[in-house]
Amino acid sequence: MDTRASTINDVARVAGVSRQTVTRALNDMPDVSATTRERVIAAARVVNYRPNRAAQGLVRGREVTVGLVVSDLRNPYYPELASELTRKAASRGWSMVLCDLGAEPADARRRLDTVARRVDAVVGHLMPGQWTGALTGIPTVILDGSPDDVERAVIAFDYETGIRAAIDHLITSGRSRIAMVDAEVPPSSRRLIYRRVLAERGLHHLPASELVAPDTHEGGIGAAARIRAQYPRLDAVLVFNDVMAVGMLKGFTRGHVRVPRDVAVVGIDGLDIGTLVTPELTSIAIDKAALAEAAVELVAALLDGVTAPDARLCRSARLTLVLRESA
């Protein structure tokens, strides 16, 4: 049984008219005869088409509001992304609403329910299951999702290209004992790629070369001493994100470990904060302006009535290695 949501194209096909005519008829616009309008309305009932209120807003000139859902505003990645998304949305005459889910699951659901009632579409780093219920029927774009298991529009992050470039750079620089500090159990996709690339390059992967820590500055500070204790011979470390990596720079300094002379450090995200520390942080960076543009384009595709709000659309965001002083 086909359970996908009907689109404006389905109405046009059944009514035997153009998309434009369906739009004008359903929005009670002029230059559509009463007979045609009735035929379009009847076709909409047949296919169970429910007009998207945001799409109607686009036609009638009402402002569209997009909700950006983040997990923790203390991570500077999210303010940087919010800034880019706000600019891209404003270029289309849209407004943005920010929703910080916080740490408590119950509170996160309440906040998501609240923002869902205020917006026409949602963009966010949402885990599987978070978009059910409150976001049912709301055009949603998942950032850093997997195209294999997400039933919404997705922008998948191409960590593979960036991590390969980072490890190859470290090897070329004479490093061979490369550790990984992750923030997730079970292993994140970043750690799985790290393992695979090491194996492809003929480097031995050891359990002692991996560590899991909180994805905060404090987590990074603590991880610096811990990884040195369990893997004393390491000469490079790939870190889950820039926030942790900056913390590790501080932790290594406290432990009198010289970066990059003793240990090279590579973060992931490409945050501005990486240029404000000493040594400046080498990072696998995502182009947040390009990410914001892709997200806004996907939202527009979901709002125009041609694509169902729960349609599966996928784009890829490429990450690139930005060389600075830490590696």
Q: How does the language model describe each region?
A:
Residues 1-64:
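N-terminal helix-turn-helix DNA-binding module of bacterial transcription factors
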Residues 18, 64, 120, 173-178, ...:
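Short acidic/polar active-site loop segments enriched in Thr and Asp
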Residues 21-23, 59-72, 177-184:
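Short beta-strand segments enriched in small/hydrophobic residues
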Residues 2-3, 65-168, 172:
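Alpha-helical recognition/docking segments in bacterial nutrient-uptake
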Residues 114, 118-126, 179-182, 210, ...:
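Periplasmic-binding protein-like
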Residues 53, 71-80, 98-107, 154-165, ...:
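Hinge/beta->alpha junction and helix N-cap segments in small-molecule ligand-binding domains
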Residues 225, 230-327:
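Flexible loop/turn connectors
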